[in-house]
Amino acid sequence: ADVPGNYPLDKDGNTYKCFLLGENEECLNVCKLHGVQYGYCYASKCWCEYLEDDKDSV
């Protein structure tokens, strides 16, 4: 089964762009900022595993 998750949003409500697909240190840091431990770059946007619908932009 696919792991649930979401695209985190910044304070302006935008997704975080990324260029290095897969394991991506920038995305890991973004995901930790949003309170989850792991994420990666997918389709040029940071994706965070187990992130709820991201209503609280940071």
Curated annotation (Swiss-Prot):
Cellular compartments per GO CC: extracellular region
Tissue: Expressed by the venom gland.
Homology family: Belongs to the long (3 C-C) scorpion toxin superfamily. Sodium channel inhibitor family. Beta subfamily.
Record keywords: Disulfide bond, Ion channel impairing toxin, Neurotoxin, Secreted, Toxin, Voltage-gated sodium channel impairing toxin
Protein name per UniProt: Ikitoxin
Domain of life per record: Eukaryota
UniProt keyword Oxidoreductase present: no
Domain notes: Has the structural arrangement of an alpha-helix connected to antiparallel beta-sheets by disulfide bonds (CS-alpha/beta).
